[in-house]
Amino acid sequence: MSTHDRFIGGCDAKPRVVLALVQDHYVGVAEGLESLRQLGTTPGVTLVVWSASSAIPRDLQDRFAMAVGGCTFVEALPGDPEALLTYQGVYVPIASNGLAFALSEGDDRDAMERTVLLAAFLGMPVAILGIGWEPNSNPWLQAGLGRAATLWPDAWRMRSQRLRQLGIEILRTPEQATDWARRALDGPRVVDAAMIDGYLRRGQREVLVGVHTIVTPSAYVRLREYGMTLKTSAEKTWKLDE
């Protein structure tokens, strides 16, 4: 078995990643903890959590780890995807369906995007869950690399409307968060021409989709033009004339 196979959990493994963005004051909220516990113990799912390091003092780290069923606290990730493959302690849980907890600045979009790009680099679907976190932009979603929702039990109407305009679903309970993540990990809802352009800029030749993904006609035009292929999480790859 190659290093890559060992890293992603073996040749037959189909690992998936949920990237949770936890706003500082939501770290200890019961709904957030329960959502992370459910997602972190879902077979075949690796949970990576981003939060500001100042938000989690040592005593809360221990309490948080116990609440979510165990996790590893690490520093911010390196930017090079190749370096991430061997970065100790961060993605080791991918092989064991465990839980990884990464500390970073809560608004560090570059770090979040690196996590999403790493998942795409390894061929893993990714879902992005915000817990009390209201994004001002969603570049990783515009690139077609994941689906997003926010767990916000007390979201008020105007804020909810703005989030929905960004294509971000509002979730109210841990159960809704778990159900959403399982659906989202099947792949993006729609792949359009702009997403294909984003893949091309990053030098990717394959576009990962799920069984329920809609590929627009303009996206097919781009795929043919760029000589790219579609690939599902089930490892099926097909030519565009099939």
PLM features: residue spans?
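A cross-family phosphate/adenosyl-ligand binding-site feature
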Residues: 1-175
